[in-house]
Structure formats: C-alpha cells, structure tokens
Amino acid sequence: MVAPTLTARLYSLLFRRTSTFALTIVVGALFFERAFDQGADAIYEHINEGKLWKHIKHKYENKE
C-alpha cells in the first residue's frame, strides 16, 4: 500500500467537504490579513523612522 502524499492528506482533511473548505479559506484569510497588516506597518515605520509622533514625542513632552 502506498503512503498518502501531502497533497492527498491536505485534500482529505481540509478540502473534501464544502464546510471545511470554507472554514479553511476564512481562517487562511484572517491569518494572511494579520500578517500583511503587521508587515506593512513595520515597513511604513522603518521608512518613516524619526518622523512619526511616537518617535519624537519625547522632545515635546513637559517634564515636571
């Protein structure tokens, strides 16, 4: 008997039934959105280092 390949196991676990297929797509979209958003924020902050308020607010805060 031949061992099932990775793609065959993925198909049988995640994509065979419509309900698990839809759930897989939704969960994948949520993780992708989170990763993309954090990556875009990191790139934006790197490009604008020293120009954003959170980087320069210590210069303008009153110290009492």
From Swiss-Prot:
A Pfam family that the UniProt record links to this protein: UCR_UQCRX_QCR9
Subcellular compartments: Mitochondrion inner membrane
Disulfide-bond pairs as recorded: none
Gene Ontology cellular-component annotations: mitochondrial inner membrane; respiratory chain complex III
Stretches of the chain found on the membrane's Mitochondrial intermembrane side: 48-64
Segments on the Mitochondrial matrix face: 2-21
Membrane-spanning ranges: 22-47
Keyword line: Electron transport, Membrane, Mitochondrion, Mitochondrion inner membrane, Respiratory chain, Transmembrane, Transmembrane helix, Transport
Membrane topology annotation: Single-pass membrane protein
Transport as UniProt keyword: yes
GO biological process, one term: mitochondrial electron transport, ubiquinol to cytochrome c
Subunit structure: Component of the ubiquinol-cytochrome c oxidoreductase (cytochrome b-c1 complex, complex III, CIII), a multisubunit enzyme composed of 11 subunits. The complex is composed of 3 respiratory subunits cytochrome b, cytochrome c1 and Rieske protein UQCRFS1, 2 core protein subunits UQCRC1/QCR1 and UQCRC2/QCR2, and 6 low-molecular weight protein subunits UQCRH/QCR6, UQCRB/QCR7, UQCRQ/QCR8, UQCR10/QCR9, UQCR11/QCR10 and subunit 9, the cleavage product of Rieske protein UQCRFS1.
Sequence similarity: Belongs to the UQCR10/QCR9 family.
Described purpose of this protein according to its UniProt entry: Component of the ubiquinol-cytochrome c oxidoreductase, a multisubunit transmembrane complex that is part of the mitochondrial electron transport chain which drives oxidative phosphorylation.
Protein name, UniProt field: Cytochrome b-c1 complex subunit 9
Species per Swiss-Prot/TrEMBL record: Bos taurus
Gene name in the database record: UQCR10
